[in-house]
From Swiss-Prot:
Subcellular location: Cytoplasm
Keyword set includes Nuclease: no
Function: Acts as a negative mediator of apoptosis.
Gene Ontology, cellular component aspect: cytoplasm
Organism: Gallus gallus
Keyword Ligase: no
Name of the protein in question: Tumor necrosis factor alpha-induced protein 8
Gene Ontology biological-process annotations: apoptotic process; positive regulation of apoptotic process
PANTHER family: TUMOR NECROSIS FACTOR ALPHA-INDUCED PROTEIN 8, TUMOR NECROSIS FACTOR INDUCED PROTEIN
MF (Gene Ontology): cysteine-type endopeptidase inhibitor activity involved in apoptotic process
Record key words, sorted: Apoptosis, Coiled coil, Cytoplasm
Length: 188
């Protein structure tokens, strides 16, 4: 027997997630994301498009990344997480911060790049994220998480991105400049 309990807050969050799922496009996302983050996302799109040689796939990966970040923010800002999820969220934030510092460090310090280490860090973030959103988002959202992390944690992609003589050197420089700004601004 279904209960007839009306919860406007829950309904509002559900509507936000539904609307967000329908409206996320580059132009909408840039109004909800700061300039530095937008620059990093744009650079991630460019390097992904070049690497995959597939504009549509690159757009899908970045759109999925934006949707996940914004849905996570909606859940967080609307206090939807229980104590365990809040603890996981704190671990996730620390892991993302570590990831950001590692991405920059591997670029700045010659001969330190370790694709397996970076891939593992990314996959650790993926697992934490799945645990955080487990009871809140659909299987489709979990698929989006996997789509994003499957691409960015791919060791071949990482090796190509960090190749000091490869075609992505300028992209990596711009990405690291943006991530460094995000670290300086306390946004990551």
């Amino acid at each position: 027997m279904a209960t007839d309990v009306f919860n406007s807050k829950s309904l509002a969050i559900q509507a936000q997630k539904k609307i967000l799922g329908k409206m996320v496009s580059k132009s909408i996302a840039t109004t909800l994301i700061d300039d530095t983050s937008s620059d990093v996302l744009d650079e991630l799109y460019r390097v992904t498009k070049e690497y995959t040689q597939n504009k549509k796939e690159a757009e899908k990966i970045i759109k999925n990344l934006i949707k996940i970040v914004l849905k996570l923010a909606i859940l967080y800002r609307n206090n939807q997480f229980n104590q365990d999820e809040i603890a996981l969220m704190e671990k996730f934030k620390k892991k993302v911060h570590q990831l950001a510092k590692t991405v920059v460090s591997f670029h700045q310090v010659d001969y330190t790049f370790d694709r397996n280490f970076l891939s593992k860090l990314l996959n650790d973030c993926r697992e934490l994220l799945h645990q955080i959103i487990q009871r809140h988002l659909t299987a489709k959202s979990h698929g989006r998480v996997n789509n994003v992390f499957d691409h960015f944690s791919d060791c071949e992609f990482l090796a190509a991105l960090y190749n000091p003589f490869g075609p992505y050197k300028l992209h990596l420089q711009k990405l690291c400049d943006g991530v460094n700004r995000m670290l300086d601004e306390g946004n990551i």
